[in-house]
Amino acid sequence: MNRYILLKTDKNELYLFYYSEGSIYFKQLAKNQNISPIKIISDVSDIFSVWYENGFIYLLASTDSNAVLCRYNRKWNSKKLNFTIPNECTKLFFTTAENSISFIYSVKENHNNEYLYMRYMLDDRWEQPIKISEILSFGNSSE
């Protein structure tokens, strides 16, 4: 399966990120230019998250053993994070606020149910995942 994400920076630069055959690539899209794609990371799952903040492009991806955070400012750097993203993950969102880091992801737990989880870093340590439905209960309401 190929996944594609478009990202526009505050400098009006447009980037295409995509997954293909175990790797994540990015390509700058520019008028009248054919820029070759660059492989960012290999041996990863097809679930990844991309965002732009303070002049940097960030990419969160998952290998068999770790989550990996990549950062771009004219050059890609990566850092292994001390947690894994479940193989059953179907969607992923990563965010920062002041000095906190958290990510939200969905996991299909059986044929009919998909659940949202949140995981965050507190005091330089990753907390255990929390089911969002356990934080924000809607009860048995059908409305």
Where are these regions (language model features)?
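Extracellular, repeat-based ectodomains that mediate carbohydrate processing or recognition
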Residues: 1-143
